[in-house]
Curated annotation (Swiss-Prot):
GO molecular function: aminoacyl-tRNA deacylase activity; ATP binding; proline-tRNA ligase activity
Xref: InterPro entries: aa-tRNA-synt_IIb, aa-tRNA-synth_II, aa-tRNA-synth_II/BPL/LPL, Anticodon-bd, Anticodon-bd_dom_sf, Pro-tRNA-ligase_IIa, Pro-tRNA-synth_IIa_bac-type, Pro-tRNA-Synthase_IIa_type1
The protein's name in its UniProt record: Proline--tRNA ligase
Family named by the database record: Belongs to the class-II aminoacyl-tRNA synthetase family. ProS type 1 subfamily.
Organism (species): Photorhabdus laumondii subsp. laumondii (strain DSM 15139 / CIP 105565 / TT01) (Photorhabdus luminescens subsp. laumondii)
One Pfam family linked to the record: tRNA_edit
Length: 572
């Protein structure tokens, strides 16, 4: 590609509304242009990267034996009503009616459509296992789109769905997909972790996320210092403390605390160690229980894990915090004065709270706290559960090492759906025994557009993007110095351009009448990994200058060795 025939569209300045590095650089490098909130035009440079990501994803899906199909973005609402997700999904699901007043949605995912397809096309266990995939546009009406294509409303996704007669068959495909995803992200050149994850609105049982490590990530991922254990913080187990509860050293006593409405204020005003405090959170109780609210207690320096709490049998799902009015009507005190002593509703305490002694908590009387509380002596131990987020330094759940926490960008997610959708939508096949059985399902997603942003978050410097070779928009840039004044430079550049193209190398030839500084800046900004600089002075010695974008290494290459050297660098 010649720059004179290309829409390069680079920018010197960063647009004011760009927040994270990938958003800034994708705009400056001319990869995307904003059309509306969460909607982007993909420009030529961006599309080149996107297509290379797609190619790798498609190749590895084909290697698993998955079969490519394409399903509509527009989906009938009755399929979503049939699966039960019409009400569950919420406002992210864009709903509309056609001219015949028939309701439809813009698909944020395709479980319903694929299940409908399979129940009409597959009738026998002999046709299973079967895995189908597509690379298709999705739409989620995000309440606050941000970070460019990292959290946009419209995005490109690879979604695969597998269908099985047995759980054993599903597990085999799930394991194969796990390996395929690992190969995809390794080939692309990402530093990633596969972590245990919650199934969320998709549903199902087992689930793994593939997280790219990046400071701008929205997820906290947890992994051990001494083993392969890794999990999303939502799912990471906070193991019970190894030590027993200490012997009480003080009596429980009531303290006036009119200006201490938060744990931070209590700690500051009364010189309490924060690990000697307990915070009490009120949530709605599950239907069928004898109480309207449930109290959840965690240590003052810990945070409630809402995903864990929501899975407790006494807690309503989705988790809903009580209003101040609800709390006052039942407890008789405001949110800043709640605690376990004389509490008129059931309580569930975290494992770390169960081993506390001589601790402070609200007295369930406005502007008062009890200090010196001890379990069993002052009140019975309530139900104990793991309901907090882990923190760095916690013991790893597998007993090996301690936990580290890093930020991550989710680029892939695999699920064992089981029969959630096939049962709801009556997708059955005739089994070996001649009777109909519900099909068992798995689903496997990759955020193709998000991969592009995640790769930039991991690969950039103050001059621009540093693409891994596998997904660079161009593998090699040819920069001829003063080509329009030197016939020799032009002749060498043209020949090298032709030779590289003939070798199947993706090359951009900067044939503009521009200053060298502009040419270098643009190629560094868009992240071309390998640059060849051609100038009269070096040609006197039969050489050109080679520069590697990632390490800034420069070296002189003989003209007759340039193509072979670049092919070696690129692994061609």
């Amino acid at each position: 590609m010649r720059t004179s025939q290309y829409l390069l569209s680079t920018l010197k300045e960063t647009p004011a509304d760009a927040e994270v590095v990938s958003h800034k650089l994708m705009l400056r490098a001319g990869m995307i242009r904003k059309l509306a909130s969460g909607l982007y035009n993909w420009m030529p440079t961006g599309i080149r990267v996107l297509k290379k990501v797609e190619k790798i994803v498609r190749e590895e899906m084909n290697n698993t034996g998955a079969i490519e199909i394409s399903m509509p973005v527009v989906q009938p609402a009755d399929l979503w009503q049939e699966s039960g997700r019409w009400e569950q999904y919420g406002p992210e699901l864009l709903r509309f009616v056609d001219r015949g007043d028939r309701p439809f949605v813009l698909g944020p995912t395709h479980e319903e459509v694929i299940t409908d397809l399979i129940r009409n096309e597959v009738s026998s266990y002999k046709q299973l296992p079967l895995t189908l995939f597509q690379i298709q546009t999705k739409f989620r009406d995000e309440v606050r789109p941000r970070f460019g294509v990292m959290r946009s409303r419209e995005f490109l996704m690879k979604d695969a769905y597998s269908f099985h007669a047995t759980q054993t068959s599903l597990q085999e495909t799930y394991d194969n997909m796990y390996e395929a995803y690992s190969k995809i992200f390794t080939r692309i050149g990402l530093d990633f972790r596969a972590v245990l994850a919650d199934t969320g609105s998709i549903g199902g049982s087992a689930s793994h996320e593939f997280q790219v490590l990046a400071a701008s990530g929205e997820d906290d991922i947890v992994f051990s210092t001494e083993s392969n254990y890794a999990a999303n913080i939502e799912l990471a187990e906070a193991v019970a403390p190894a030590h027993d509860r200490a012997v009480p050293t003080e009596d429980m006593h009531l303290v006036d605390t009119p200006n201490a409405k938060t744990i931070a204020e209590l700690v500051e005003q009364f010189n309490l160690p924060i690990e000697k405090t307990v915070k009490t959170l009120m949530v709605h109780a599950a239907e069928g229980t004898s109480h309207k609210l449930i109290a959840l207690l965690v240590r003052g320096d810990h945070e409630l894990n809402e995903i864990k709490a929501e899975k407790l049998s006494l807690v309503a799902s989705p988790l809903t915090f009580a209003t101040e009015e609800e709390i006052r009507s039942i407890v008789g005190a405001g949110p800043g004065s709640l605690g376990p002593v004389n509490l008129p509703i059931p309580a569930i305490i975290d494992r770390s709270v169960a081993v506390m002694s001589d601790f402070g908590a609200g007295a369930n009387i406005n502007d008062k706290h009890y200090f010196g509380i001890n379990w069993e002596r002052d009140l019975p131990v309530p139900e104990v559960a793991d309901i907090r987020n882990v923190v760095e330094g916690d013991a790893s759940p597998d007993g090996k090492g301690t936990l580290l926490i890093k930020r991550g960008i989710e680029v892939g997610h695999i699920f064992q759906l089981g029969t959630k959708y096939s049962d709801a939508m009556k997708a059955t096949v005739q089994g070996e025994d001649g009777h109909n059985q519900i099909v068992t399902m798995g689903c496997y997603g990759i955020g193709v557009t998000r991969i592009v942003a995640a790769a930039i978050e991991q690969n950039h410097d103050d001059r621009g993007i540093i693409w891994p070779d596998a997904i660079a928009p161009f593998q090699v840039a040819i920069l001829p110095m003063n080509m329009h004044k030197s016939y020799r430079v032009k002749e060498v550049a043209e020949k090298l351009y032709a030779d590289l193209r003939a070798s199947g190398i993706d090359v951009i030839f900067d044939d503009r009448k521009e200053r060298p500084g502009v040419m270098f800046a643009d190629m560094e900004l868009i992240g071309v990994p390998h640059t060849v600089v051609i100038g009269d002075r070096n040609l006197d010695n039969g050489e050109v200058e080679y520069k590697h974008r990632r390490n800034d290494e420069k070296q002189m290459l003989k003209l007759d060795n340039v193509v072979d050297y670049l092919k070696q660098q690129l692994g061609c």
